[in-house]
Amino acid sequence: MPGAPAPLKAAAAAALTLFASGCQFSVDAEQARICRIALPALNAPGSQIIIERTQPGPGGRSVRLDYRVEGLVGPPLRHWAVCRFAAEGLSASKAELVGVDTDRGPLSGSSVYLLRRFYVDSVEGLMADPGPGDRAAGLREVPEPVAYLAQQVLVSLPRTGIYGLLAAAYALVFGLVSRINLAFGELAAVGAAAAVAGVAMATGLGFSAPLAGLGLGILCALFAGALYSAVAGHFAVARIASRSAQPSLIATVGLSLFLMEYLRLAQSPVTVWIPPIWSDTLPLLRAGSFVVGVTPVSLVTSGVAAAAAAALLTTMHRSGFGRAWRAYADDPKAAALSGVDGRRLLAGTLALAGAMAGLAGTLVVTQYGGLGFAGGFQLGLKALIAAVFGGIGSVAGALVGGIAIGAFETLWSAYFPIEMRDVALYASLIAVLVFRPGGLLGSRDPGPREV
């Protein structure tokens, strides 16, 4: 029986690798910010504080700042401070300051409490943040238009990956049975909720490192997305796939509403957020005072999406499942005569598509912190547009469409009125449907198609 285990195994192996790794590759930006805010309270009023170096402190759960103090009189003075915190990684208490050591001695417990209680979270403290220092020294200078465009391209990377995976989920099902499952956005929300639950389980078990929490979150999201998609798709798609397209379309609309309400009741209307991770900007280029940068979390999100897309394409072109899928999509009767079980193939396809949707939801949580019970609808609609734009029956075309739609949204928001972005996007969809109904990599036939 041709199944769909290869990409799931690849994603699971990646998640286990992340789970086994317990180290961070950057200083926690939130903890570094809190430590910087504490510095003005440790020095003379009116002094200018310039951060020279930020690095992990000794023993974990700490940040060390080397800084220079320039007062109104006297030469500049160099100091250091080590801020210790209650937790690290994905723990909710990682922003709780519990100790401060300096080159002039440690602060007492009462001083740390007063600093945390009345200064760190106050407006005065936020305004006194000296900033991360000049990290742009030595960067390559480029023209300002080039720098601005490069920044927008970097900003679009996570969005293109998320849209691409969701669009591929649409393409997997439509390419096999010519049916659109409108519930993939909600399946992404299911995956996001499962990922948050996985992170909570990891932190509850004592694994607060981001890689460990996200690894378990990815496993939970893959399992939940595949399970919900396979079970729900059996009733909303598989059992009525032999009928006309309208009953299946209506059934998936009902499935979308059901999943949305189910999530609202299961996790409450309040969106659960995970703490920000890997959010310290890495400077790359500069144009005068404008610095082009990217956050490590954006690189992780886009990298995981690219790896999942590569695993999916490899599976579709080189595995037994991919050959069976392409054979059944071309001619179901001939594929059945060759030994392909259409029902089991559709079940595997639904599970694989749900896993891709669940992974997309995990990437939303990783990049933006959370995804509410109603947030999947708009996400799924944009991904459907991406699938149509790239060629809804083509997995590769859907991935290309996700890249195109993500880049289009980002660049339009950067150069044109943002309130007209969705209008322009839907107008572009109409143009594609009129002049190239098969999409970029789909059929060129402009004739009527079953939808």
What are these regions (language model features)?
Residues 170, 205-255, 262, 400-405, ...:
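Alpha-helical transmembrane segments within multi-pass membrane transporters and channels
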Residues 106-120, 130-166, 194, 206-217, ...:
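Membrane-interfacial amphipathic/re-entrant helices at transmembrane-helix boundaries
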Residues 290-371, 395-400:
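Helix-loop-helix "hairpin" substructures at the membrane interface of multi-pass membrane proteins
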Residues 186-190, 239-264, 375-388, 404, ...:
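Pore- or pathway-lining transmembrane helices of multi-pass membrane proteins that form conduits
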Residues 240, 245-318, 348, 411, ...:
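Transmembrane helix-bundle core of multi-pass membrane transporters
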Residues 144-162, 315-320, 349-387, 412-423:
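Inter-helical junctions in multi-pass inner-membrane proteins, predominant
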Residues 135-136, 145-148, 266, 270, ...:
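Cytosolic-side transmembrane-helix boundaries in multi-pass membrane proteins
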Residues 149-200, 231, 235-247, 389-395:
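Single transmembrane alpha-helix segments in multi-pass membrane proteins
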